[in-house]
Amino acid sequence: MKLDLKKDHNYQNGIYDFMAGTKSIVVANKEIDIEVDYAWDYASDPVITPTIIHEWKYLDKLVSKNVLKNARSILSIGGGGSSRTHEYLSPVTQEFTILNTGMWDLVNAQIPIETINTYLICATGEDMPILDSQIDAIEIPATLDHVIDARKVIEECYRVLNGGGKIGITLGNSDSWYRKVVSNLRIQVTSNHDHHHNFHFTSKDVENLLSEVGFTEVKTIGTAYLKLPKTIERKMKAPVLLAAHRFISNTMLRLLFGNSKGGMFLTYAMKPTAR
Ligand SMILES: C[S@@+](CC[C@H](N)C(=O)[O-])C[C@H]1O[C@@H](n2cnc3c(N)ncnc32)[C@H](O)[C@@H]1O
């Protein structure tokens, strides 16, 4: 993987910092602040239940199977911190790059085994300091709703991917069946954390974005269909209960509701090979 080292940067403590104090991006004549202070360790957040963590692991497995498999060079945009991608890398992976605007995620990033070259880059997904056609697979884990210019990020992904390379985007779904029920019944929900989201995507929005930029074979897998009261979810720690929860959530209810109505989703696609 070749970095664009002509761009201004510092290299310190194993991190390439290309932000050099950049704090905002201008989109449509509006200056918008970049998220640089994200720092969330879910393990110490009481609202995160065993079932939520189990759902995240399931989504990670889907990314591994549908996006990262057979990729020699992998880029994670918004990874690091509590992300567990290092556990799901393909045996053929030789390079793993984490690009994030936040130093906390980079400093606390879990590094894979040392035979895999790991790059930590502080930069925006909108302007990646990576030369063209360097990467086999990109994951954007729960991050596209945090960026400022989602289309620019997807265009940058297209640029740095090799032909035949894959992209996978995971997100909470603004069009999930239970969010609709909650909003129709006007039930007050206390948010599970105070992260700021610039966008609230549906899987259709992400599919359209990928197609517009030129990606093909765009597919979505919906996940996390089952939501129980927190008091019950907190008690579901036994592996057999979690397995039953996953079966109902991601097999039975997915069959019932279809791929676009889960609480979370993975949308993945391919950059076509040049003809
Ligand atoms: C919900 S977090 C993703 C998961 C996170 N790694 C964790 O462990 O929880 C969203 C991430 O997006 C990063 N981010 C925000 N704006 C970004 C941008 N424009 N380009 C790249 N990363 C960005 C934040 O720093 C944050 O780490």
Label each residue range with its predicted role.
Residues L5-K69, D105, P112, K166-H193:
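Conserved class I S-adenosyl-L-methionine
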Residues L75-D127:
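Class I SAM-dependent methyltransferase SAM/SAH-binding core
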Residues E139:
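A conserved beta-strand element that flanks and buttresses the S-adenosyl-L-methionine
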Residues A142-H146:
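Short catalytic micro-motifs in class I SAM-dependent methyltransferases
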Residues R151-K166:
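A short glycine-rich, Lys/Arg-flanked "PGG" loop and its adjoining helix->strand segment in the class I
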Residues V182-R186, K219-R275:
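A C-terminal cap/extension of S-adenosyl-L-methionine-dependent methyltransferases
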Residues I187-D205:
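Acceptor-substrate binding/catalytic loop of class I
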